[in-house]
A protein has these predicted regions:
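A sensor for short, sequence-defined functional sites
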Residues: 1-445
Length: 445
């Protein structure tokens, strides 16, 4: 089945598989993409008795092996041999008794830590004519300028003329002007959910339809900022789902995302208009993945990006204890900054599933459920409740937990086994719980 423009999925099944069954399979991948092959992951969520990785290629190709992870092969062969009637090089890696990969809380992408290998072409030698494919990020910058669906789009300056209001154009402070342009793009154009370094239908289509992929929206954001006289460059990176960008192996095929970067008084400010809730220097969580490359006019600069803006969750319960021992009241769950981006995007993606999440988390009866934008860039869900499930009667006394349904017996840092991977937060965060309880006049604590 076709998953994306250049990707297909092949599925197969094993009949009569039961707990404890040992399955065996082999597959061969033939790729026309000689320069950058896909990663092959060598750890799974099931134990593996034996697995083997084989990479064969003609001797006139030269490859580097980008090997990442903590799993070491028990057997390794890297040698020349005769195959298919000509000289080949062959890499064979054998792994025995591989334990299952165990995921841990507070890890953005498990695949960053799963052992994998990726061959990358570094040279060819046809008829003693040697050609090196080793590149730098400056080379990548130069090539992207030539690509019609990247640099070619940025060069269409006429698409950004006479678009912004004169009020925006006249703002003297660069950061304030950039913020207004970000707001304009967010309110005018809508991201279609597709991530990419390159445009799909092009920026002209974005202008006509008001919908586009991430590259179309953010490249147009760059064009508008430049038209307004700002010093703005594209910054390319990997999204979290793509894995950390390996800066040691520069290639156009690695990054899959681009945002706008304003340089002002020696400082950098990042902008991403794909999310309606993003702010200056507050990107959607998918974009915070450590390594990034800033494509300046004359050079490429390697940067590290992290989210240092604190997000807060405010959980507010205003409850009344009735004389029949029921509780009634109102609950508000309000998120700010990164948490607001996540909540809003999840809500817009599927409103029914978002409400279902609350019904599964809070199993008592509630009504007047509402999710909405509040205070400009905050997202809030609220509901009213009436339940008899919070109070126990013991010896003529009524006993209830003062946090009511906000009480949690376990926390997310309850891992008992030794931790293997770094703790990764989407942002610094704080959770504030406030519970106000009104009791009948003739009751006392």
């Amino acid at each position: 089945s076709k998953e994306q423009k250049n990707r297909f999925i092949q599925k197969f099944t094993f009949p009569n598989v039961k707990d404890g069954s040992i399955i065996e399979y082999q597959y061969q991948l033939n790729s026309p993409f000689l320069q950058l092959l896909d990663k092959t992951y060598l750890e799974f969520d099931i134990p593996v008795i034996y697995e083997e990785y084989i990479f064969d290629f003609p001797k006139f190709f030269g490859y580097n092996y980008n090997f990442q992870g903590g799993l070491m092969p028990k057997y390794k062969e890297d040698q020349a041999q005769m195959m298919y009637g000509q000289d080949y090089y062959s890499l064979r890696l054998g792994f025995e008794n591989v334990p299952p990969f165990k995921a841990e809380n507070f890890v953005k992408n498990d695949r960053n830590y799963i052992t994998n290998i990726r061959p990358e072409l570094n040279s060819t030698n046809f008829n003693n004519l040697f050609k090196s494919y080793a590149t730098t990020w400056d080379d990548v910058r130069d090539k992207l300028k030539e690509y019609d669906d990247f640099g070619g789009q940025l060069s269409k300056k006429s698409l950004a003329r006479n678009v912004l209001s004169q009020d925006i154009m006249n703002i003297p402070i660069p950061k304030e002007k950039a913020s207004k342009i970000l707001k304009f793009v967010q309110s005018t154009y809508t991201w279609d959910g597709n991530v990419g370094l390159f445009t799909g239908d092009g920026i002209k289509s974005l202008i006509d339809t008001k919908i586009g992929n991430s590259a179309e929206i953010n490249l147009y954001l760059i064009m508008l900022m430049r038209e307004a006289g700002l010093n703005v460059s594209p910054m390319i990176m990997n999204t979290v789902n793509r894995g950390i960008l390996n800066i040691a192996f520069p290639t156009i095929g690695a990054p899959n995302y681009v945002v706008a970067c304003l340089e002002d008084n020696g400082n950098y400010y990042l902008y991403d208009a794909t999310s309606k809730f993003s702010l200056p220097n507050l990107l959607p969580p998918r974009a915070y993945n450590y390594n990034a490359i800033l494509l300046k006019d004359k050079k490429a600069e390697i940067l590290q990006i992290n989210n240092f803006i604190e997000s807060k969750t405010y959980l507010n319960v205003d409850a009344k204890l009735n004389e029949d021992t029921t509780f009634e009241g109102n609950f508000k769950d309000r998120d700010t900054k990164t948490f607001a981006i996540l909540a809003y995007d999840e809500y817009v993606d599927n409103k029914q599933d978002y409400e279902k999440k609350y019904k599964e988390r809070y199993t008592f009866n509630f009504n007047n459920y509402k999710s909405e934008v509040v205070n400009d860039n905050e997202f809030q869900t609220s509901f009213d409740f009436n339940t008899d499930g919070f109070v126990d009667g013991v010896g003529g006394k009524l006993i209830f937990n003062p946090l009511l349904f906000l009480y949690r017996q376990n926390h997310e840092f309850n891992q008992t086994e030794e931790r293997k991977y770094p703790i990764e937060f989407l942002s610094p965060y704080e959770t504030v719980k406030k519970v106000t309880i009104t009791i009948p006049d003739n009751y006392k604590f």
